[in-house]
């Protein structure tokens, strides 16, 4: 297994027989790059894409 591959399992959970993502993917970078969750925004560490959370 690649270095850090164990930590990717934190972003998924199993509900019944399905695997569900906990975080969103970056729309610019594509699948596999998750958006980091901050207090007021979601941001991509790779390309800098930011979505602000609605109040």
Curated annotation (Swiss-Prot):
Keywords, comma-separated and alphabetical: Metal-binding, Ribonucleoprotein, Ribosomal protein, Zinc, Zinc-finger
GO molecular function: structural constituent of ribosome; zinc ion binding
Gene Ontology, cellular component aspect: ribonucleoprotein complex; ribosome
Domain of life from the UniProt record: Archaea
Cofactor list: Zn(2+)
Binding site for Zn(2+): 26, 29, 44, 47
Free-text comment on the cofactor: Binds 1 zinc ion per subunit.
InterPro entries membership: Ribosomal_eS31 (IPR002906), Ribosomal_eS31_arc (IPR022845), Ribosomal_zn-bd (IPR011332)
Single GO biological process annotation from the record: translation
Pfam (any one): Ribosomal_S27
Subunit structure, interactors included: Part of the 30S ribosomal subunit.
Family label: Belongs to the eukaryotic ribosomal protein eS31 family.
Name assigned to this protein: Small ribosomal subunit protein eS31
Gene: rps27ae
């Amino acid at each position: 297994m690649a270095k850090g591959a164990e930590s990717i399992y934190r972003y998924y959970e199993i509900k019944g027989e399905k695997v569900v993502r906990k975080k969103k993917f970056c729309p610019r970078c594509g699948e596999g790059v998750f958006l980091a969750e901050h207090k007021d925004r979601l941001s991509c560490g790779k390309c800098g894409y930011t979505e602000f959370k609605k109040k």
